[in-house]
Regions:
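Short helix-loop capping/hinge motifs at secondary-structure junctions, enriched
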Residues: 14, 34-42, 135-140
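Short beta-strand-centered segments that line the small-molecule binding cleft or hinge
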Residues: 1-27, 31, 39-40, 92
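Hydrophobic hinge/microswitch elements
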Residues: 65-117
Length: 156
């Protein structure tokens, strides 16, 4: 069965999609507790660590990299991985830092596997959305999927 629905972050308008906002999601800079000597708030600083994230079109990657450019902050390199779970495991293994939605790392932050690093006075946010193609029938399975997604974001 093919679902033609998905969860994503708002980056513009698309009249071909029926969208439901799931709410604002805060972003957090995370590292392992062993990471040392990094500062992403001091302008002009070089951090000898890797930035671990997914593809270049990722909205939270774009926000992080734009902020670093504004602050003239650099990192050793960027490691691109396909899944958030892989990113979290590499960060926990002290390979580098990442900038992710808080809900994606909440469990690891609570357990102490990851720590939040200072990144600014206010946390930046993104709008999570669920969408499906406009004008297409919504199957019972897709309707259930959309309900589950909405309930998990409301509860979260």
């Amino acid at each position: 069965m093919l679902f033609r629905s998905g969860v994503f972050y708002r980056v513009g308008n698309d009249d071909a999609l029926n969208r439901r906002e799931l709410g604002e999601q805060s972003l957090v800079l995370v590292a392992s507790p062993q990471i040392a000597d990094v500062d992403f708030t001091e302008p002009g600083r070089h951090n000898a660590c890797s930035f671990i994230i997914n593809e270049p079109q990722c909205v939270f990657r774009q926000i992080f990299e734009s902020t670093l450019r504004q602050r003239r902050i650099t990192v050793e390199n960027t490691i691109e991985l396909l899944s958030i779970e892989s990113i979290k495991r590499c960060v926990a293994a002290n390979i580098g830092v990442s900038y992710l939605p808080r809900f994606a790392v909440e469990k690891e932050l609570e357990s102490g596997e990851l720590i939040e690093l200072p990144f600014g006075e206010q946390s930046q946010t993104i709008t999570a959305m669920c969408a499906h193609h406009a004008g297409k029938a919504v199957s019972p399975a897709m309707h259930t999927f959309i309900q589950c997604v909405e309930e998990s974001f409301v509860a979260g």
